[in-house]
Amino acid sequence: MSAVIAMWSGGEAISSPILQDRGFHYGDGLFETILFEGGGLQFWQRHLDRLELGCQRLGLQMPALSGVIEHLSQVLPIDVRAVVKLIVTAGITGRGYGRDVTEGGLHCLSYESIDVPDKNSVALSTSPVRLSRQPLLAGLKHLNRLEQVLAKRSLPEGCFEGLMLDTEGLVVEGIMSNVFYQK
């Protein structure tokens, strides 16, 4: 099961993405992927906090998301496990890398049901693709994910996830997951 639930630009509902959007041309935007399980979004406030921080850092308008949980609980069955993706872009501000402060970019909300592998048995490999260091983007889920695309392509057959290191060889994240460790 997969669907785009809602898409809007400048506060107005739209039916298809706008190809002149800076998110398509420059990766000028952010996203959050959130697990929907048991009828609710897991760690919703943490995702909102990170999205708000990212919007501040990149100069994007934070979308109004007050009804998202209620809307999802109406369209998704309580027993479904799904990944909800929220995308926020800078919108259309003209050609070139520079942009004016946007009054509202493209915002897209979608979901896809998922099968999660047994959490006690996941094939993991260290990716040969190294993440570059950019302090201004650290901690943000920005739309330029080419390093992760290349890392996923480099995984051995049958391997579910790859461990991503930076250029100094330090553990940063999984290709598609967070990494936590305890001393």
For the regions a language model picked out, list residue spans one by one.
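Helix-start/capping segments and mature chain N-termini
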Residues: 1-74, 78, 83, 89, ...
